[in-house]
Regions:
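Conserved phosphate/anionic-ligand binding catalytic regions in large, soluble enzymes, centered on
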Residues: 60-84, 178-186, 252-278, 358-367, ...
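Glycine-rich anion/phosphate-binding loop at the beta-strand->alpha-helix junction
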Residues: 179-181, 186-331
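C-terminal catalytic subdomain
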Residues: 276-280, 288-388, 392
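Solvent-exposed alpha-helices and their adjacent loops that cap or buttress functional pockets
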Residues: 55-59, 66-68, 106-109, 150-151, ...
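Acidic/polar, glycine-rich intrinsically disordered N-terminal extensions of enzymes
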Residues: 1-73, 77, 81, 101, ...
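Flexible, glycine/charged-enriched surface loops at secondary-structure junctions
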Residues: 33-34, 100-106, 143-156, 200-212, ...
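Alpha/propeptide regions of enzymes that mature by internal proteolysis
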Residues: 1-46, 51, 73, 89, ...
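Small-residue-rich
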Residues: 45-50, 54-166, 170-174
Length: 424
């Protein structure tokens, strides 16, 4: 059944729930969970963290009509920032018309490290460790046999000498973690390897730990957008495309711009990571390290022009070692619901959706910046927050926002005064 999302953003909260039910996007059980606003319980929260005194909520939204590799998705977003969902929805709709996103997973492995120091003969130690690679991989797999049964496990091992104030001999373990992110898995394997590596190197082990710089879990998303989709006026569409390509170059050249450029990308990525129960801090750390791989901090996405085909071409590659199993994913009702909304994707499929949405978010931001300016769409949503802060009820928000925008006055004192006038 073809789903129509026309006017979804204009509907009331209740009408949106009714549309989800009518289109059977969720199982009856999950539909009920959503309608009853079922959240993680304090009892469960108390087992997940420490010193718990309650739970904390954020807006839960949907970005419809996201086309990735020919498959259409309804993507859950968790974010409190105004205009992020609107921008993602706008961009995804344009990109869908242009053919959607193409995404691919280059590899799906995690990397862990054992750092050795006080190694008297690093070259000899390196040779010894490499010569025992097969035995070390077997030992790692014995430490976590369940992943081997699921088709994963330790796949490779290499050694590097790191020169510095203190010299380190670092052993890198590459592990196929299947559907899990694999932090506990990697750390368990590395702990098992430490005493053997100390013996082989005749050195001391400083630590064994997963790395969040997941260069073995790279995902690329790309899209091609004809100039005509950027504006109703052909010449203006080309001009916008040219400016977006220049904005991309600016983010490659200037770290001050790159930081904001990448923050905008993560407006979308973090929203999905949170919704799907993934560790957004780990993903951000790895991506920002990846943005600095050439020795200076750069924008993660690139937009170029294909003048022959009259298209704007976007592409982004970054580490995306997300999980669909493990951690707290199965314990939070809203996270379980998110996975169902997406069609219960595999970890690889989810990674492709997430990177595509990061590129979508970036498209929307750059297009706004080089044309209407970022504030035009952003301000109306910011003013809604101001109206709520002033104490407006649901029925009072729209007229108060309209008045504030008309008067171009955006402060709490004025909003409260206008609200009093509205009520009198």
């Amino acid at each position: 059944m073809k789903i129509s999302w026309n006017g979804f953003s204009k509907k009331s909260y209740q009408e949106r729930l009714e549309q989800l039910q009518a289109q059977a996007l969720l199982s009856p059980e999950k539909q009920t969970s959503l309608e009853q606003d079922e959240q993680i319980s304090v009892t469960v929260a108390d087992q997940l963290s420490e010193n718990v005194v309650g739970t904390f909520s954020l807006p839960y939204s949907l970005v419809p009509e996201v086309l990735v590799n020919g498959q259409e998705y309804t993507v859950p977003y968790v974010t409190e920032e105004p205009s992020v969902v609107a921008a993602a929805s706008y961009a995804s709709k344009i990109i869908k018309r242009a053919g959607g996103f193409t995404a691919q997973v280059h590899e799906r492995q995690m990397i862990g490290q054992v750092a050795l120091y006080q190694v008297a003969n690093p070259e000899q130690a390196q040779e010894k460790i490499v010569s025992k690679k097969a035995e070390l991989l077997e030992l790692a797999n014995q430490a976590y046999p369940s992943i081997v049964k699921r088709g994963g496990g330790a796949r490779d091992l290499h050694v590097e000498q790191i020169k510095g104030e203190t010299d380190f001999l670092v052993v890198y373990l590459h592990v196929d973690t299947q559907e899990a992110m694999g932090a506990n898995m990697l750390n368990t394997m590395l702990e098992a390897l430490k005493p053997v590596l100390e013996e082989l190197s005749q050195g001391q082990s400083l630590m064994g730990i997963l790395s969040n710089y997941a260069t073995d879990s790279l995902v690329t998303a790309s899209c091609r957008i004809a100039f005509r989709y950027l504006s109703r006026q052909k010449d203006q569409g080309r001009e916008i495309a040219e400016k977006m390509a220049l904005a991309s170059q600016f983010a490659q050249a200037d770290p001050y711009r790159a930081a904001t450029h990448n923050k905008g990308i993560f407006n979308g990525i973090d929203a999905i990571l949170i919704a799907t129960g993934n560790d957004w801090r780990a993903i951000e750390a790895g991506a920002h390290a990846f943005a600095s791989q050439d020795g200076r901090y750069q924008g993660l996405s690139r937009w170029t022009l294909d003048l022959e085909r009259e298209e704007l071409v976007g592409e982004m590659t970054l580490p995306m070692p997300v999980a669909t199993k493990g951690g707290s994913i199965g314990l939070n009702p809203r996270v379980v619901l998110s996975h169902e909304l997406l069609g219960n994707p595999s970890a690889k499929e989810l990674a492709q959706i997430i990177v595509s949405m990061g590129l979508s978010q970036n498209f929307a931001a750059l297009k706004a910046l080089v044309s209407t300016g970022i504030q035009q769409g952003h301000m109306k949503l910011q003013v809604k927050s101001l109206a709520l802060l002033a104490g407006a009820s649901e029925s009072e928000v729209a007229p108060l926002v309209e008045r504030l925008i008309a008067e171009k006055t955006f402060n709490l004192e004025t909003a409260q005064r206008y609200l009093e006038n509205l009520r009198s």
